[in-house]
Amino acid sequence: SMTTDPIVIVGAARTPMGSFQGDFSSLAAHDLGGAAIKAAVERAGIAPDSVGEVLFGNCLMAGQGQAPARQAGFKGGLPQSTGAVTLSKMCGAGMEATILAHDQLVAGSRDVMVAGGMESMTNAPYLLKKGRAGYRMGHDKIFDHMMLDGLEDAYEAGRSMGTFGEDCAAKYQFTREQQDAFAIESVKRAQAATASGAFAAEITPVTVKTRKGEVTVSIDEGPAKAKLDKIASLKPAFKKDGTITAADRKSTRLNSSHITIS
């Protein structure tokens, strides 16, 4: 039955944010999801078998194996008895998972839920659409799962999501200079927050195996590697005379964030 008890967040964690083909290239999305789940459940101080269900957003599912959210749950130390649902919603999948988890708790369907999101754009595979039927003769296409199912419009084939940002910039008259200034300030704030340790409490470090041994990643990769003096000279990313550059757009990244609510 529906509960009148307040719904509260009892634990939260995220991995560092990795760059495209960067520190987390060897890890699948469910590896990152598992790391975030494990940390958040530990921080909540609850028994893993008390979690009723995992709801995790993940839009680029191809190539990961069956049920990525369930794999993340196992890697996060949750038992086989804990159910899991992987859901897809462009950009807002993790937030949608959290909303739906809240609603299940309000409805009284569950007592404890795990919710969050995970993505690894680096590991999104290339697709052979005609592979099952066979290629008869001549050249054909392979499709980028990241672009086709994540970053391109489904209704105007091949149109990048970034071009809609250009439409907004034109409509609201955001100049290149304004966007560059905003990007620079944003990176500076992220760098300052990292240096001061402001993000440390929310991040769970992730250990990555490399050819040189194990490396522990504990800070966000993008801000640490950003070159602010290069921003003003970057070429437009989506149209020849556009105002949006690689510095202004949302980065292509790999990470997972997760909360436990009850």
Model-derived features: positions:
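N-terminal extracellular/periplasmic Venus flytrap/periplasmic-binding protein-like
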Residues: 8, 13-15, 26-34, 178-253
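Conserved catalytic cysteine-centered active-site region
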Residues: 27, 58-112, 155-163, 225-249
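Acidic, glycine-rich active-site loops and adjacent beta-strand->loop/helix elements
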Residues: 13-16, 57-62, 89-93, 117-124, ...
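Flexible glycine-/small-residue-enriched beta->alpha junction loops
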Residues: 112-168
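Conserved active-site "lid/cap" helical segment
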Residues: 2-59, 63-64, 68-76, 83, ...
